Amino acid sequence: MKSYDVMTLFAQQLERSIASSDECKTKVVITPSSVNEKGVVIKVSLLKTFRDKEYQAKSKARSVRLRVSVCGTVESQTGLKMATVLIEKLDDFFEQDSLRLEEIVEGANSMQTIRKIPNTRILQRISQEDSFFYNPDSTDVQDVQDDRTVIITVPEES
């Protein structure tokens, strides 16, 4: 599986798992993108892709390091609520046991099913020092940024 495919599948998986609700509209954007969403979005950015020799000694694996950010402009308490709800939904997503990359597979009668891709894993790292608001003491419109690093390891194509 190629790194771009991993990133795309992960973004789709996030969008499915963190479904929009009345209190929070969810938009997942892969950067770079010409999409200029108003409000708070989840951005997925490629940081690095590399052959991972430590994952499984018997087979070749590739690790894709991504930045997943809840970011945007908060103009009111409603925007602040939306940002915190998205962060909490991401926390819930990453707390799943044995988190694996998923893909949608066409089945009989054009039925789509979600399949966990074997021998994949998804890990996250969070820095407790990350800033949420750039200037928390200001009463002006605020830019928010909550970053986490995600590492997805997949079997490498032969």
List the model feature ranges, each with a label.
Residues F50-D52, S76-T78, P136-S138:
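Residue-level signal for secondary-structure boundary sites
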Residues K58-S59, V85, Q142-T153:
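Short intrinsically disordered coil segments
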Residues K27-V29, V41-S45, R65-S69, R100, ...:
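Ser/Thr- (and often Asn-) enriched beta-sheet segments in non-cytosolic proteins
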Residues Y55-S63, C71-D97, E102-A108:
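Extracellular/virion structural assembly segments
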Residues K60-Q77, R121-Y134, D146-R148:
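Oligomerization/assembly interface segments of phage tail-like spikes and tubes
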Residues M1-K58, V154-S158:
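Small/polar-rich, solvent-exposed N-terminal microdomains that initiate assembly or binding
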Residues K89-Q145, E157:
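Acidic-leaning, charged glycine-interspersed low-complexity segments
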